[in-house]
Structures are given as structure tokens and as C-alpha cells.
Amino acid sequence: MAGVQTLGRARGSTWTWRPVARDVLLARAFHSCTELEGRFYLVGGLLEGGARVPSNDTVIFDPAVGQAVRLVARGSPLRSHHDAALVGGRWLCVVGGWDGSRRLSTVAALDTEREVWEAWAANPGNCPPAGLSSHTCTRLSDGELRVSGREGGTHTQRRYGSIYTLKLDHRTRTYCYKEEGCHTTSRSGHCAALLPTAGPHPGHQLLLFGGCNSVGPEVAGQWSPGKIKEEQPVAPHLREQLARLVSSGQGLQQGPQSLRHHSCSVVGPFAVLFGGETLTRARDTICNDLYIYDTRKSPPLWFHFPSTDRGLKRVGHRTCLWNDQLYLVGGFGEDGRTASPQVCILEFFI
């Protein structure tokens, strides 16, 4: 493990990303990063800007000790611009993505106990989308995901505005897509957040942020109280810090416009968005802004906390919640080509 470089605090800033680890194995963008039993599983991604073929390696990062190791596992797939989700507390399912020659809608699963990759089969009733990349997969329950968005040409505009439910069965090693009746604005490089609705009997809604010329989130699913059993990680201290941060800001009705390839993590009633690439500028397109979407009241409010530290600019990165801390992993920096080898945690000065 190489030494950790200190970025420091930008003058007047109320927050920063503080480096806690550094390893060349972590340097990648457009990868997936999934927490399982206190370890982060990084799958695939691009190792440098302009790379045509994605990585096929899997790296495990242990945040408790700050160490990363490459997992040697048979059948590791070439993937970037994919998404991943856990099934059965054991199988890390990688959904879709770019393999260097085409977009896929197939499912590859890492059996984390046997450390072997498996190619799962489609059920006979499978109705898959066109190949997926820069899409999102959101867990609704163990073995059920909501899939939205994808990259593609204009002739497939309607289809990549479609929403799919993806059922995953680890017992039979199979999957099945079902197209939902609703559609959204076509988008890619967006993020998705399953958030509680305001009120005395909160249900849930799935919101899509960014990935198109839009300033507000779009609803990709709504569920009445008690329908969603998926439990978010408990992060009481981080939630308190976010509440204090937004209390110091000015709430807005509109969020960031035309943002893509940013990160998003749900912390209680807050969606925490960071970085990404803006489509509103021809130059200096990679961002280092922190946005908080606060759903505690109706209507929800946006809070924007910019940074003057250009070293924090990221695109194609991931954030991951563990042990009451929000971690930033990978991504390309300001030049859009150099992958960051650092792991950072979100730190506040309030």
C-alpha cells in the first residue's frame, strides 16, 4: 500500500473528501463498487481515459485496514459502464455493461464464497432490453432489481426510456427481465435512489437523477407503505452531519442540470450526489460539486455545496456507505483520463 496523499481543505469549504488509502489496484473509472460484509468489491471499469477494452479484474478493498487485493477468479468478465447488486448475501451479480465490442443485457455472478464467476442463464420468459450500458440497477428486495436507462442511438429512443424489473434466482442461476408499463425520459449516466416519501405513513419512490437535459428527478416507481422491505445501512452520525450541513444552506426547488456519470448514495432521507460531468459547458466539464436532496419535507429541497479544490473533480467514480462513513472510490480526475488510486471519506467542517 502506497502512502496516502493529503488533499487538504479548500478555503471556506464546509466539507471535503479526505484520503484514507491509496493503491494502484483501485485506479479505475466506470466500474462497480459493492459492499459485502465490510469489504468493497470493485469489478471491471476503464483503467485510463480512451481505453477501448475494459478491465476484467476484481479487486477487494478492506476499508478497516486500508488494503486492496486482486481476486483471482475463473471467468472474470470484461465490463465497464455496468451495474451490480448482491443476491442471497453471497452472489455479486453484474448486470449489463460494455465488454469492449458491444453492450450486454446478460448477468454474470461472482460466487464470493467459492470465488468463481458464473454466467447465469435467461429464463424462457425473459424479455430483455437492448444491450445496457450507463444504466442503473436498484435493489427492491433480495433477487429483484429495477433497471432504468441505457446508452444507445436515436432509433432505440423509446426502448432506453423503458423500465424493467429483473428477477434473479441464485438457486437456479437464472434471471428474467420484464418490461414495466411506464416509461421515463431517455437517459444514460444517471443515478437512481430509492427514497422514503414524506408524511406520517411513508412509502418509497425510486427517483432518477441526471443523465439528460433535466434539472429535477423523475419517478421510476412508487410503492405504498410496507411494500419495500429493502433496508438501507444505518448511518446515524453521517445522517446527523448531513442534516447540519443542509441547515447551513439555502434550499432550492431545482437541482443540477444536465449532469451525468456522477455518484449517488442514500443516507436516510438524503440522496448525496457528487461530481460527474456537466453537459452545459464545452470546457472544464468535470465537476467537484456536492448536492444533497432532502426528502424530509414536501416538496423535497436541493442543497448545493460547491468546492474550489480542483483535485476533487471526479467522473465515473463510485460512492459506498459503510460503518457510518461515505467512501469515494476511483473515477477519472480533472483531465478526464487519469484514474484516481485513492479512497476517500466525506468529512465535514460544521
Swiss-Prot record:
InterPro entries: Gal_Oxase/kelch_b-propeller, Kelch-typ_b-propeller, KLDC9. The keyword Disulfide bond does not apply. It comes from the Eukaryota. GO terms for molecular function: cyclin binding. The keyword Phosphoprotein does not apply. Kelch repeats lie at residues 39-89, 91-137, 325-350. Keywords: Kelch repeat, Repeat. Interacts with CCNA1. This is Kelch domain-containing protein 9. It comes from Mus musculus.
